[in-house]
Amino acid sequence: WKAEYPSHRARAKTTVSGVLFDFNDVKAVETPDEKRIAEYEMRWQRGGLSFLGAFSDLLVDPQANATAANFVRAKIRAVVEDADTADLLTPNNIIGCKRLCIDTGYFETFNRSNVSLIDISEGRIEAITPKGVRANGQEFEADAIVYATGFDAMTGALLKIDIRGRGGLALRDKWDGGPRSYLGLSVAGFPNLFMITGPGSPSVLTNMITSIEQHVEWIRDCLVALRERGLRRIEATEQAQDDWVDYVNLVAGLTLFPTCNSWYLGANVPGKTRVFMPLPGDGHLSAADCRSRE
């Protein structure tokens, strides 16, 4: 496999997600039950995100998605012995609009005597105690506590920097109503500011390494072109940015992604404007779109 590594990387750049997954062009709703279940079973056993490539309509058609969600629910309930715990672990609506967990021994973990799943969606963690954690009026003993508080995806790191554009406008003020960009690479009013896999690009919905490389190469080519033409500044227009944001919103609206309260929408950050930030669809086509605008 390593001997063919360069060709693998080249092929990855021509795929939907930048990963050498086997994407099925057939629709789940047009596939006989037995064949559809066999496809899900094969991908479940394989593990990983390729499960969502089982059929072409899983993330655009609720009926198709329900066939996948029901399959996963049955798998989880067959593994997790406690019914209440299994219910907490199963997707309650659309599957795949949040990061997918395809089993690699994860669900079996909840059958261990020293593992408990505590639902705090309706309550909260009340206190850290000398012995562990108190939640929902009960104390849970722990030797160590790992803080998994989530992250401010796609915009958080940029907005922690005091980036200023024309007239001293701060990027955090420009994006007060949600991030807007052109191609996920630049922001109107901020000349010579380049983002890599920023909001408005396929970004986290693809293989990030492939997408990062594509953006870095585009920025490199842009800088070379500026130098060759004797130019010192490049900036997206407001109209181009508006058109691109409209396109991203149109594509996202054709999918099931915006139906979940996920970090793709910024739903995990209190007070953050709900905007679907990545561009769903074909990362290869997005790369081609960038090249067409050079």
Could you tell me what each predicted segment is?
Residues 1-294:
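N-terminal FAD-binding dinucleotide-binding subdomain shared by FAD-dependent oxidases/monooxygenases
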